């Protein structure tokens, strides 16, 4: 069913969330724009971004209020992921081969995959990797102390999640650089550092990155069928107690989801954490002065403030009224977690970074519902472990310049961040 495109909301004719130019603005300007959008009586409508992949569709509604993001998340029967959750335009079929993971599915297909995957994360495996996280964070800080001033992203925040997720899956160190490079390509947004500015070339780069990752997991899975190991690829490539297992295509697309999501989001949160703790020395002191009691609240505040994933898309399955707003079958909506996490109706003084903020019902891991972030527990452990090592061993570590931000509407990324610290 196609719905005729409504006219764009005239109240925001100077704001266009579909244009790269908007996402190149200074964060303060974007905050101000979203604050204006949240004042509107109804979710604003935007035309689809222009792309050579497809002809633009009928546009989408931007859910910018916390209540709307939460309501859409908890009603997956109305707000479906099946037409794609990570692209505002409907992608051509060849993308589904590598990126058709469970993030782009509804139940019962989504429930089946999530069940198989959840069972692969056994308590023993989780315990093993929790120990590895702390040990890896300590080794990274050892290297930082030996290196001195450096790019924090390259030397610290990118290293921890990359090593943990690769080792969890069973990928050897020789493949780490390839995995990082392909992750950067897949999540490049419109950033010319990682992706060609020629759109046809850029599409080829993204598909090649997906194909390379799929080939890697297929090769490792075949090896694990012969010689099993204590890793996730072995667990996912063999049947569980109910005789369920992932098909090779499901394994490849899940692997890409897990490695890409498990890499970029924690890296983004840690990079922004250093910026925030540099800009708010009072919050740094507060956290260091009672680290173990304050760190869990601080992690939630970092995830709220950063919102590593800016939005996800849903498609409306039937005519429905949600929070007083009429939606038609076929409508597209974008759930702007970044804006919901700054909603003045929910968070007092939302632009203030407060490590003691409570309550903190942020949607930085997605809203409640079946698509709540599968890796939230691991991400929290990684951020906690890295900040414990950094702040307790190198309490003066600080950013020395403005972050070099990723040009993307989807990931609130930092590409480079120079840092330094006082030598003891």
Question: Predicted regions: what is each one?
Answer:
Residues 1-424:
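Cytochrome P450
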